[in-house]
């Protein structure tokens, strides 16, 4: 049985396995520096049993690592950058943390990161869908209850709506401009992640042999902070 190390392409949401050399079933990828590498794309997402979660330090910063077992017996580590370049929680990581308290170790799920932008949308909807799955045929279990997410606090039409997660606070900067203060939100979600990890019966094994990517998998800072959504992110057309 193999150990598989998976990353997420921020721009597409695709889960991929990286290789420096050409491999059967892999696609060519050329980064912004012109360096070619190869990727095996998991277009259906990752179907796997959740075995553990950890925070790992890498040369490029902290990552959330999901330790999972695939239906064929392979161990898959699905890694997400924890912070963006402004030290806010990265989009995929934040989405994943909001659903972690509803997940169970030993349960099988489909993990599907997404980055969706409609023709008339100004900003993309970025996150991670997690639903119960059947590993024997890599399918979503139809009719199964979806894991619930922590809810956001927000203000709409001057009405404050209280949720689980503290609201983003807008403050006036020294030059009169408005700046976003996400510290309370970030701390709450970071504490939620650590509480989930602390509650696990066992820790995920170390990823000593993780292959180094050709470029740092940095999560870009969003051009605009993602507004809390009232609709369930997992009501997706896939």
Predicted segments with their positions:
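Low-complexity, polybasic segments enriched for Lys interleaved with small residues
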Residues: 212-226
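OB-fold ssDNA-binding interfaces and closely related basic DNA-contact patches used
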Residues: 1-82, 87-101, 116-168, 172-190, ...
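Polyanion-binding surfaces on beta-sheet-dominated domains and ring/shell assemblies
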Residues: 129-130, 195-213
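Short acidic, low-complexity intrinsically disordered linear motifs used
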Residues: 224-238
């Amino acid at each position: 049985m193999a150990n598989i190390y998976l990353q997420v392409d921020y721009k597409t949401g695709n889960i991929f396995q990286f290789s420096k050399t050409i491999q059967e079933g892999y696609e060519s990828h050329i980064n912004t520096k012109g360096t070619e590498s190869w990727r095996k794309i998991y277009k259906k997402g990752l179907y796997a049993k959740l075995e553990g979660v950890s925070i790992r330090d890498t040369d490029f910063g902290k990552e959330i690592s999901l330790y999972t077992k695939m239906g064929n017996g392979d161990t898959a580590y699905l890694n997400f950058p924890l912070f963006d370049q402004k030290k806010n929680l990265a989009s995929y990581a934040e989405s994943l943390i909001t659903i972690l308290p509803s997940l169970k170790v030993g349960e099988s799920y489909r993990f599907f990161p997404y980055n969706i932008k409609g023709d008339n949308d100004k900003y993309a909807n970025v996150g991670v869908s997690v639903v119960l799955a059947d590993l024997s045929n890599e399918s979503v279990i139809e009719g199964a209850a979806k894991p619930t997410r922590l809810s956001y606090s927000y203000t709409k039409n001057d009405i404050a709506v209280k949720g689980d997660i503290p609201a983003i606070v807008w403050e006036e900067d020294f030059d009169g401009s408005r700046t976003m203060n996400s510290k309370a939100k970030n701390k709450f979600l970071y504490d939620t992640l650590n509480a989930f990890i602390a509650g696990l019966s066992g820790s995920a094994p170390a990823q000593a042999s993780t292959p180094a990517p050709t470029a740092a998998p940095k999560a870009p800072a969003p051009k605009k902070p993602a507004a809390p959504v009232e609709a369930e992110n997992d009501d997706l057309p896939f």
